[in-house]
């Protein structure tokens, strides 16, 4: 009943109005899985390749018909007749057939869409929710938890058309006892932040991930505005709500000088100086997690940053590790960071994603499940976070249905699982247990 009988690929539109790949996997017995690949804006140089057509006459070169053709052609031919329940085998067939290190033949967007659609079809054939099937694939059947959200309520960097250099300023509703309560707290802070910004005469237009994107005089000003919003909402910063940042520092690193240039503030830092700039912010505000605090190739700088901050807060590698076990293994051996951001499309298959989560956890690193800035209504990351008991999720702010779809799926899952999926809150964050 779980044999693949048909695979369909199509070009659909993501949350930025760009094309992406959607795949359907059909099984015997009429079971169907549907999934879409997300797309990033600030991308690590060692990510698996997102295949675009380059035909300027369609979607300004961003079409994905080549990737769709790969799904409908060689990928479909290779997986039809295979057992969808054997996820590792399905992924291996596609990866081997592609034959490249970075999935550049078919595109990680093609392989991932089929990989996730296959998992959904297999879950349907087994008569279980996707998160339960993922837990079984993960070797942790029946072990679930609800993730602490990192809610990106001020967007900067590559995610917004403003002067703020740091890409994401996030809140974590640690005072919540449940995921649903965390969503409520996040929503209340989000709406109060709009009032704070309006009172200052600032824009409340939103960026790619649903957070506000005002022009601010400094990164500290963003943190101060959030502090004011938290207090206006009736919460205590540091007790009910903590802060997190994604610097995406590769985006403001100057490779010619080796310096970090905060153009919004008119400041330039060496690698060590920027670490101390961040350290100063953590002294002034309850920041418990910093992602990509340096350029992805500045491993010497990351070793120093981990030495300075790694005992106090969570240091997450995104562009640094790109959900790649080879790179993560090297980072673990060198004591670089203490957490990994998990993005399906950085590596391009569910099996490899699960391997990265396992490697991180086995090494005492945390794993933060994440969306991309270009998303669809696909909410698979919600099931991934619960099914691997990862403990933390980044899926944007409290606006835009491409972000809210994930929160709503988490609410449904929590309702279904009840006390089988505890919400541990701040205990999940490295250095905060």
Curated annotation (Swiss-Prot):
<dbReference type="GO" id="GO:0005576">
    <property type="term" value="C:extracellular region"/>
</dbReference>
<comment type="function">
    <text>Catalyzes the reversible conversion of 2-phosphoglycerate (2-PG) into phosphoenolpyruvate (PEP). It is essential for the degradation of carbohydrates via glycolysis.</text>
</comment>
<keyword id="KW-0460">Magnesium</keyword>
<keyword id="KW-0324">Glycolysis</keyword>
<comment type="pathway">
    <text>Carbohydrate degradation; glycolysis; pyruvate from D-glyceraldehyde 3-phosphate: step 4/5.</text>
</comment>
<keyword id="KW-0479">Metal-binding</keyword>
<dbReference type="InterPro" id="IPR020809">
    <property type="entry name" value="Enolase_CS"/>
</dbReference>
<comment type="similarity">
    <text>Belongs to the enolase family.</text>
</comment>
<feature type="binding site">
    <location>
        <position position="394"/>
    </location>
    <ligand>
        <name>(2R)-2-phosphoglycerate</name>
    </ligand>
</feature>
<keyword id="KW-0964">Secreted</keyword>
<keyword id="KW-0963">Cytoplasm</keyword>
<dbReference type="GO" id="GO:0004634">
    <property type="term" value="F:phosphopyruvate hydratase activity"/>
</dbReference>
<feature type="binding site">
    <location>
        <position position="318"/>
    </location>
    <ligand>
        <name>Mg(2+)</name>
    </ligand>
</feature>
<dbReference type="InterPro" id="IPR000941">
    <property type="entry name" value="Enolase"/>
</dbReference>
<keyword id="KW-0456">Lyase</keyword>
<dbReference type="GO" id="GO:0000287">
    <property type="term" value="F:magnesium ion binding"/>
</dbReference>
<dbReference type="InterPro" id="IPR020810">
    <property type="entry name" value="Enolase_C"/>
</dbReference>
<feature type="binding site">
    <location>
        <position position="343"/>
    </location>
    <ligand>
        <name>(2R)-2-phosphoglycerate</name>
    </ligand>
</feature>
<dbReference type="InterPro" id="IPR029017">
    <property type="entry name" value="Enolase-like_N"/>
</dbReference>
<dbReference type="GO" id="GO:0000015">
    <property type="term" value="C:phosphopyruvate hydratase complex"/>
</dbReference>
<feature type="binding site">
    <location>
        <position position="372"/>
    </location>
    <ligand>
        <name>(2R)-2-phosphoglycerate</name>
    </ligand>
</feature>
<feature type="active site" description="Proton acceptor">
    <location>
        <position position="343"/>
    </location>
</feature>
<feature type="binding site">
    <location>
        <position position="291"/>
    </location>
    <ligand>
        <name>Mg(2+)</name>
    </ligand>
</feature>
<feature type="binding site">
    <location>
        <position position="167"/>
    </location>
    <ligand>
        <name>(2R)-2-phosphoglycerate</name>
    </ligand>
</feature>
<dbReference type="Pfam" id="PF00113">
    <property type="entry name" value="Enolase_C"/>
</dbReference>
<dbReference type="InterPro" id="IPR020811">
    <property type="entry name" value="Enolase_N"/>
</dbReference>
<feature type="binding site">
    <location>
        <position position="373"/>
    </location>
    <ligand>
        <name>(2R)-2-phosphoglycerate</name>
    </ligand>
</feature>
<dbReference type="GO" id="GO:0009986">
    <property type="term" value="C:cell surface"/>
</dbReference>
<feature type="active site" description="Proton donor">
    <location>
        <position position="209"/>
    </location>
</feature>
<dbReference type="GO" id="GO:0006096">
    <property type="term" value="P:glycolytic process"/>
</dbReference>
<feature type="binding site">
    <location>
        <position position="246"/>
    </location>
    <ligand>
        <name>Mg(2+)</name>
    </ligand>
</feature>
<protein>
    <recommendedName>
        <fullName>Enolase</fullName>
        <ecNumber>4.2.1.11</ecNumber>
    </recommendedName>
</protein>
<dbReference type="Pfam" id="PF03952">
    <property type="entry name" value="Enolase_N"/>
</dbReference>
<dbReference type="InterPro" id="IPR036849">
    <property type="entry name" value="Enolase-like_C_sf"/>
</dbReference>
<comment type="subunit">
    <text>Component of the RNA degradosome, a multiprotein complex involved in RNA processing and mRNA degradation.</text>
</comment>
